[in-house]
Amino acid sequence: MHRSEAIDELEWELIPASGHPAHMHMALDEVLLDRLIAGGRGPAIRFWEWTEPALVIGSHQSVMNEVDQAAARALGFTITRRMSGGGTMICEPARTITYSMYLPMSAVAGISFRQSYAALDAWAVRSFVDLSVPASYREINDIISPRGKIAGAAQARRKGFVLHHTTIAHSMDVQLVAQLIRIGRDRLSERGVRSAEKEVSPLSWFTKLSCAEVTAHMERSFEAAFAARRSALSPSELEQARGLVDTKYATPGWIERLP
């Protein structure tokens, strides 16, 4: 396991889980990264609470290749596109845990891009092990158990700063993967990066704690590991994010930018 000492030296803020629609969570990532770049906020971790089922596709993925759009509509899943790369994630209220970290790239200087994923998720692996979950890291960007994938991470890098976020399956109807994500099906578009086919191994296979209880445990783990102080989203950050939802993240021009 690789870990940069500089990550430990940052003065972290922790934004506890708060519920928002899927497009709003995407917009908040961009707003908070831009605030960090502009010097309006320090390094932070934000925990998400999902308020609706969502299919979250990576920035460089084709909607047609990745998502069964008819199935998504029938099952009530919102399709949204994040600013970072990586594969498609199924996210559901009370079943999915997500966190985002916003930090200067200097904190992961001296280690490779691949190693930065493990360094930034090392605390989460330890948090799961504390719950007797047999978790470990698999390059490039997965937290796993001996039975499959628990979580996947993705990054975006902008102007010397990093957005790193990780999505964790607390519980899941594994049949949804085949219904909603077009892994293994024929390409409908020549564009875009495909998701990898991996067995899912939810945390609920190993712990009786609820999704909210695991989230609270992870927040405490991060606080203890990094001496983080609790913070909150400001009214101006929320207002700016709502504006980005309207002008970008909820628009077909963004969601279908790689058809």
Regions found by a protein language model. Name each.
Residues 1-70, 74, 78, 82, ...:
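Active-site loop/lid in soluble adenylation, ligation, and acyl-transfer enzymes
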Residues 69, 89, 94-222, 247, ...:
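Catalytic beta-strand/loop module used to bind and position nucleotide/cofactor moieties
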Residues 76-96:
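Glycine/serine-rich anion-binding loops at beta->alpha junctions
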